Amino acid sequence: MCIRDSPDLLLILVPRHPERFKDAREMVQKGGFSFTLRSSGEIPSGSTQVVIGDTMGELMLLYGIADLAFVGGSLVERGGHNPLEPAAHAIPVLMGPHTFNFKDICAKLQQADGLITVTDADSVVKEVSTLLTDEDYRLWYGRHAVEVLHQNQGALTRLLQLLQPYLPQRSH
């Protein structure tokens, strides 16, 4: 499955750092894709193939309209980005094998069928194709991803409760 072959697909490409916005735009232009910039405020048309998220602070909004998410920085040895952000929207999370920045949560997501590990462009295409054509498969992974998030909420409160006997009492 490819954007060129599937006119109803829309890729939302969000560079992690603002200095990469220009590179993303040039890459999309060079590929010959029809695109809009999020910063333009333009609503994507039926012929838009890519939306470049070139604004700050809107990643969670963009995950909220997605059917699945590939979390970058993980196919190369950068360590990946936060998989809990897409998991919060109950969408399948795909990441490469380099997840050392979020090792523990990625392990939990993997064990719970909330994370799909891909190794290269071909495996990304294969998994995305399966997720987009098999709704049950897509919903399964999304449901398990958000369950991991719910199971791990409140960690700070639990930690503070455990530490309470050892913390000095504050006088009011």
Residue ranges with predicted function:
Residues 1:
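Phosphate/diphosphate ligand-binding glycine-rich loop within oxidoreductases
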Residues 4-172:
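Nucleotide-activated sugar donor-binding and catalytic core shared by glycosyltransferases
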